[in-house]
Amino acid sequence: MVATLANLNFPYLILSACLSAILLSRFLPFTRRDRRPTAKGCLPEPRVFQWDVFFGLDIPISQGRALQQNRYLEWLRDLHASMPRTKTFSVNFGGYRWIYSIEPEILKAVYATNFQDFGVEPIRQHPPGFKPFAEKGVSTSDGEDWAFSRSLIKPFFERSVYVSTDRVKPFADKFLTFIPEDGETFDIQPLLQRWFLDMTSEFIFGKSQDSMTHPERAEVIWAMADVLRGTRLRAQTYKILWAFNWDWWFKAIEKVHGFLNPYIRSTLAELAERQQRVKEGLPVGEERTDLLWSMATMLPEEEALRSQVCIIFVPNNDTTSIFIAHCLYFLARHPDAWRKLREEVTAVGDAPITFELLRNMKYLNGIMNETHRLIPNNVTQIRSALSDVVLPLGGGPDGKAPLDVRKGDIVSVTKTVMYRDPDRWGADADEYRPERWDGMRGGWHFLPYGGGPRRCPAQMMVQNESGYMLCRLARRYARIEARDKEPYRARMRIGPSSLHGVKIAFYKE
């Protein structure tokens, strides 16, 4: 035995011992949960059978492979299908308890009833899941930091801002000039991304990127896509970040920061100069009204400001454009739905397209809701338990008993499965049918923008912009045809987008 040990490299022994200690520290708390007392009335949740019962590495490896192969949505559906007798279950995820659910009442508890008991910082800041892309921001912070981040942006998502379609109109006018003539096949997804980049860059920075005219200026979109893909993967695997090579993600971050830094630095310099002139009693010009300027007045520090801007600009630059692309993906495959939309739009003639007009278009809103339902942008809602808490459902073999959740546990509500649950939506849950929304009331079973205090502040703005663009297209074109050869496959960023694009053709007659 002594001779054998003597032949081993001592540093490797130390490394092996350290790794074993780390893995055991992850595994032992998970196994000891069954021996700790639980709250009165609570029952343990069902658990998924796993090959790696000790360290729980089979789930993150399987999940990571699904993300790389662009079949993450299918992976989630298969995972839930493997537990047909319950809507809530858990897995050992790298030695940690990860609770999956499609129960609306659990979503309500996490987002509203027990809001203070759940957070995102343990996932996105500790360990550094989103670093060096961003640290503190409205979607990475809890408590006072979150409240401050929300205060930075809240004025720009008030009713007086989101109800205006005047901001959207010139960009939509320009967008329509880039659509090919009748019957020509084109991919509308990247064009929508450039349209939205131009509009959001003016809204946030006060100056449009004008990438519709100059496509080369849209390169930052593809870097942002890689950043979003990486943040999604890191949010899902934040307990085992060490297991992956992140070089590609860091390179994408450098490109995005390189795009944002000139805007931020020039804004801070302009702000300092303006404040100095005011101090000296010198005249100043009209103050800027863009979001970055407003944020800089409250947070005049470059790195902290960049973190806040990254969290707002990068994820949101993908959301609206991809959502509209998904709406058109379905409409191109359902000509009756396009016909009904066009009838609703043409019924108002040439009336100005206002927020109130869009809100009253029932079929248009049914189309948007049905698209949110079938391809939700937020596929999962993930929170970390900040304290011990009892959820109203999830325990027992059928998931109907209360469930004891411990500090550090992860609760993940799978919206892409919940929104197709036949118990809630009927036997046609997988079918595209905008008519189902006629008279349907909302609730915790359908929250495309989240709920509770952390509900997306841009909800009405996204709906207004998306509805406006769909209305303009329906007013202009009599028909839309699908020209995709491939079935839909989701490529994950923060949310899913079509791996093969959205290839369509429009006809005016």
From Swiss-Prot:
Q: List the pathway annotation.
A: Secondary metabolite biosynthesis
GO MF terms, alphabetically ordered:
heme binding; iron ion binding; oxidoreductase activity, acting on paired donors, with incorporation or reduction of molecular oxygen, reduced flavin or flavoprotein as one donor, and incorporation of one atom of oxygen
TM segments? 5-27
Location in or out of the cell: Membrane
Chain segments annotated as coiled-coil in the UniProt record:
none
Residues with an annotated glycan are 317, 369, 378, 464
Indicate whether Heme appears among the record's keywords.
yes
Q: Which InterPro entries does the record cross-reference, listed alphabetically?
A: Cyt_P450, Cyt_P450_E_CYP52_ascomycetes, Cyt_P450_E_CYP52_fungi, Cyt_P450_sf
- EC annotation from Swiss-Prot or TrEMBL: 1.-.-.-
Q: Name one GO cellular component term.
A: membrane
Q: Specify the superkingdom.
A: Eukaryota
Please give the cofactor(s) recorded in the UniProt entry for this protein.
Answer: heme
- What membrane topology is annotated for this entry? Single-pass membrane protein
Entry keywords, A to Z: Glycoprotein, Heme, Iron, Membrane, Metal-binding, Monooxygenase, Oxidoreductase, Transmembrane, Transmembrane helix
Question: Record's family?
Answer: Belongs to the cytochrome P450 family.
According to its UniProt entry, the function of this protein is described as: Cytochrome P450 monooxygenase; part of the gene cluster that mediates the biosynthesis of fumosorinone, a 2-pyridone alkaloid that acts as an inhibitor of protein tyrosine phosphatase 1B which is implicated asa negative regulator of insulin receptor signaling and a potential drug target for the treatment of type II diabetes and other associated metabolic syndromes. The polyketide-amino acid backbone of fumosorinone is first assembled by the PKS-NRPS hybrid fumoS.
**This protein's name:** Cytochrome P450 monooxygenase fumoA
What organism does the UniProt record list as the source? Cordyceps fumosorosea (strain ARSEF 2679) (Isaria fumosorosea)
What gene is this protein translated from? fumoA
